[in-house]
């Protein structure tokens, strides 16, 4: 019996079409049996002082998790907190102070329950340009120069954690911020990187920044603020409740707590939170 080629090809074409549709469905649905998996794009909001550390850690993480893309938004913790509250897409937030994280938790219920951790600790330090024309060598001498009115200090503004720590230090010495401002003795940066740049470029006589930023900029830390002067400098981190990639965000946060990331953090000057 002779079989028509047309009659034979029709069911074969149907079978081929079904296989293609099935394969496409598997890929679109992220089926583990599909030929490839869907990649995740994580948006990480992080304090500006974490820039160098996270960029280096990201390279290591991409080797371990090639299907996860990391997009960083570095700025002051106060600015990032406001962006999150205004609806910006963010999967993971790393703040330079508990204050901004607390506000996200209490004011807008933005944090994924039980994902928040204290990740790192830093130190607040005094730096000057390499010339150090004012011969500042300690917070004590900085305070004396400010009282004498013969120095320009760079610090973060009031919604930047680095600025808030600086204000505590100046208050500890009995200095009044309004008086310092009225005499033109302070200049502000919108984040700690701007403050660091002002000192590095010599546009300010001294600056109050983090130990890690001093290290990255090659500026010697002339003095370190005690916990009594400004409190403990803790960096909390949390997955956001609104994240579309909560598992991947938690996985990256776990990696940041692990030994490979720890080695990078500690080399730059951070310590892991207790």
Predicted segments, located by residue:
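Exported/periplasmic ABC-transporter solute-binding proteins
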Residues: 24-59, 78, 85, 97-98, ...
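Ligand-binding clamshell of periplasmic/extracellular solute-binding protein-like
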Residues: 74-81, 90-104
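Active-site phosphate-binding/coordination module
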Residues: 113
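Sec-dependent N-terminal signal peptides of Gram-positive bacterial secreted proteins and lipoproteins
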Residues: 3-28
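Conserved beta-strand core positions
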Residues: 42, 68-70, 124
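Signal peptide-proximal N-terminal region
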Residues: 59-72
């Amino acid at each position: 019996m002779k079989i028509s080629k047309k009659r034979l090809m029709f069911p074969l074409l149907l079978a081929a079409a079904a296989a293609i549709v099935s394969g496409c469905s598997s890929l679109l649905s992220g089926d583990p049996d599909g030929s490839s998996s869907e990649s995740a794009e994580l948006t990480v909001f992080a304090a500006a002082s974490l820039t160098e550390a996270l960029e280096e850690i990201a390279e290591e993480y991409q080797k371990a998790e090639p299907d996860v893309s990391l997009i960083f938004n570095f700025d002051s913790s106060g600015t990032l907190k406001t962006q999150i509250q205004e609806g910006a897409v963010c999967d993971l937030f790393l703040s330079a102070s508990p204050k901004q994280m607390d506000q996200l938790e209490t004011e807008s219920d933005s944090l994924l329950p039980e994902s928040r951790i204290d990740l790192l600790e830093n130190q607040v330090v005094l730096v000057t340009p390499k010339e150090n024309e004012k011969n500042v060598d300690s917070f004590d001498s900085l305070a004396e120069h400010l009282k004498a009115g013969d120095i320009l200090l760079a610090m973060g503004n009031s919604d930047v954690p680095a600025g808030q720590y600086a204000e505590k230090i100046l208050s500890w010495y009995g200095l009044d911020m309004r008086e310092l401002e009225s005499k033109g003795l302070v200049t502000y940066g919108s984040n700690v990187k701007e403050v660091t740049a002002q000192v590095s470029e010599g546009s300010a006589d001294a600056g109050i920044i983090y130990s890690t930023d001093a290290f990255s900029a090659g500026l010697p830390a002339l003095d370190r603020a005690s916990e009594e002067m400004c409190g403990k400098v803790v960096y909390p981190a949390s997955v956001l409740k609104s994240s579309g990639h909560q598992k991947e965000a938690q996985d990256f946060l776990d990696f940041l707590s692990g030994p490979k990331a720890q080695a990078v953090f500690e080399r730059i000057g951070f310590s892991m939170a207790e």
